[in-house]
Amino acid sequence: MQTNSSLLNLDVIQIQHYQQNRYPMLFIDFVKEALPGKYAKGYKNFSFNEWFFPAHFADEPNVPGFVQVEMLTQMFLMTFLTLPGNKEKKTSFVSISNAQFKRKIVPGERVDIESTLSFYSRGVAKGKSVGTING
């Protein structure tokens, strides 16, 4: 849903119009605000029934690192896939720098994600994503 001429607000169905990730690999629930070519803000809610919790780990469920990286990456994708002509383009990443995991994410928590795009040219993007737990 477009809120003005350039600022976007997207639910999970609308997100799928921009990127190719689908269940069980879609790890963002809502894009609260996206300014194409600049930034995207949104969140992911983790409920106890996520497919990975029974295996990671039964006695102390927490979100696997690869899911956390993918979640941050998917919000970053929204900074440039929302640009005209980029809808549903296939993407891949070459490197991740300075990744830090401060603590476990457990069932019932929400991760708020802010991504900024610092460079985009000829299909190559560079930027930053930060996730904070429960605001």
Where are these regions (language model features)?
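Hydrophobic beta-sheet segments that form the core/acyl-binding groove
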Residues: V31, I96-N134
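Non-catalytic linker/capping segments at the edges of enzyme domains
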Residues: M1-N62, K89-K90, I105-V106, S121-R122, ...
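Hydrophobic beta-strand-centered segment that forms part of the acyl-chain substrate-binding groove
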Residues: Q2-N9, M75-E114
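Active-site helix/loop of acyl-thioester processing domains in fatty-acid/polyketide metabolism
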Residues: V31, N62-K87
